[in-house]
């Protein structure tokens, strides 16, 4: 499990020394040694590796990593570029981007371009056993990612949260910074996207907020590979 550095290490490094994290580390290590677990161990903290704390301008909160082969790589909603099947929730995100900003729908689900621009693509649980959704919930990741969210909440600059679905919206009480914008909608899953995710216009709203506050907006267009 590749650790954090830079501003992230300063902000949440103390978590690694807490008893809950020792238990979490032992659990995850045992899972990797006895089962297939996603993402690959070196990718667990990619959300923070790709998006330094002082560069975060948007946080999109997911739940579990994808649990099928060749999908998860440490960024919420994103899949590896070699994965040609775009997950249904991400297909719906692309549809909303197309309707909201006119973005072309790409042939891949690799969202690193967003992460490189300051979009923190964070899951609340950072590992999962293959083909067993939610299998690593309740073992400590939630405490750790709460510390990540708290570190973002403390940033003294404009930041946008996109919270889709009730689990993501359960974090709202933690988000107390008046300089930040909270956007909520149903989850983009096919089960709920038609209840208000489609038409939420979160991507244009985020960019308008960033521009109003002198922050470079996000180029949401993912290019074909």
Give names to the regions the model predicted.
Residues 2, 14-163, 167-170, 175, ...:
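A polyanion-binding, active-site-adjacent surface
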Residues 5-9:
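Short, contiguous pre-domain boundary segments
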């Amino acid at each position: 499990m590749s650790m954090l550095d830079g501003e992230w290490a300063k902000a949440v490094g103390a978590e690694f020394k807490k008893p809950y994290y020792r238990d979490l580390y032992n659990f995850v290590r045992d899972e990797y040694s006895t089962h297939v677990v996603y993402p690959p161990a070196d990718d667990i903290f990619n959300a923070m590796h790709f998006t330094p704390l002082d560069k975060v301008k948007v946080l999109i909160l997911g739940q579990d990593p994808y649990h099928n082969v060749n999908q998860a790589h440490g960024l919420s909603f994103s899949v590896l570029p070699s994965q040609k099947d775009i997950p249904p929730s991400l297909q719906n995100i692309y549809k909303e981007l197309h309707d909201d900003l006119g973005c072309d729908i790409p042939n891949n689900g690799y969202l690193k371009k967003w992460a490189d621009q300051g979009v923190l693509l964070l899951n609340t649980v950072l590992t999962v056993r293959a083909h067993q959704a939610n299998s690593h919930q309740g073992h400590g990741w939630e405490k750790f990612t709460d510390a990540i969210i708290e570190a973002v909440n403390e940033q003294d600059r404009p930041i946008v949260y996109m919270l889709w679905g009730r689990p993501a919206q359960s974090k709202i009480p933690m988000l107390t910074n008046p300089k930040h914008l909270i956007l909520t909608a149903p989850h983009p899953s096919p089960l709920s996207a038609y209840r208000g995710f489609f038409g939420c216009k979160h991507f244009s709203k985020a960019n308008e907020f960033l521009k109003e506050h002198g922050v470079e907006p996000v180029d949401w267009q993912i290019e074909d590979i």
